[in-house]
Amino acid sequence: VEIKSGYGLDEANELKMLRVIKRLKAEHPVEIKSTFLALHAIPLEYKNRVEDFVDLMVNKVLPKVAADGLADFVDAFCEEGYFSVAQMNQLIDAAKELGIPAKVHVNQFNVIGGVEAAVKRNARSVDHLEELTEEDSNVLLEGNTMPVALPACSFFLRIPYTPARKIIDAGLPIALATDFNPGSSPSGNMNFVNSLACIQQRMLPNEVVNASTLNGAFAMDVQDALGSITVGKKASLIVTKPLNSLAELFYYFGENNIDQVIVEGKIVEGKAN
């Protein structure tokens, strides 16, 4: 599970959110990755001086985040009316100097060059991609950055869905995530996300399984320990109810067909058979 900050919009509240995430990481059995979403939205008091807000987050808050070990990644919302490619690059470059890799939000509404910049800077993932050009796909093919689709966000906002079929047919991998947040995707239901991927994004059931497991693990840099049932990896997995086929798992959208949740070999949901 990845948990992002980004809703504090000032030093005290961003650090508070990240400290809460750090505590959850220590107390919860599920693997948690924390992301400092430094450039998420522009506070009203910085409406006409965005550069000052970027300077605050990059040059004042980020060093404290790094010093206290509060983030596994940084993130920015690179979009018209929010943060520019140059501002995103400023954050990524500063974080790299402090040993923190990046994950970024790009191409949700407009194509402004964020994908190319993120791939050149070895971002771990690029999230959204509802708008995607052939040039963006070619850039992604040359890099090691995971495209991530967020279909529940498209559903809630009634915007186009990430062209997953186009991405896969181009020879690229794709991951799926809920984008669970109060503004654009108020649902953490991964079952629904997977069904949307099949229904709205024309993904095949086996592609959805791969996107929501191993590729999702890669997007969080835990693919060596999680994401597949493999010798040497942690025994964290789900067991479904009896099904006639893999497709049935996503066909009955809104249904929970998970019988057991196992985390590192221990059943945390469901009963032992």
Per-segment meaning from a language model:
Residues 1-112:
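Metal-coordinating catalytic core of metallo-dependent amide/deamination hydrolases
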Residues 46, 249-251, 272-273:
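Short, charged, solvent-exposed linker or helix-capping segments at domain edges/interfaces
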Residues 54, 58, 194, 213-216, ...:
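Alpha-helical structural signal
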Residues 101, 111-228, 240-247, 253, ...:
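Active-site-adjacent C-terminal substructures of enzyme catalytic domains
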Residues 232-235:
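Loop/turn positions that initiate beta-strands
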Residues 256-273:
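Short peripheral tails and domain-boundary helices/loops at the edges of structured domains
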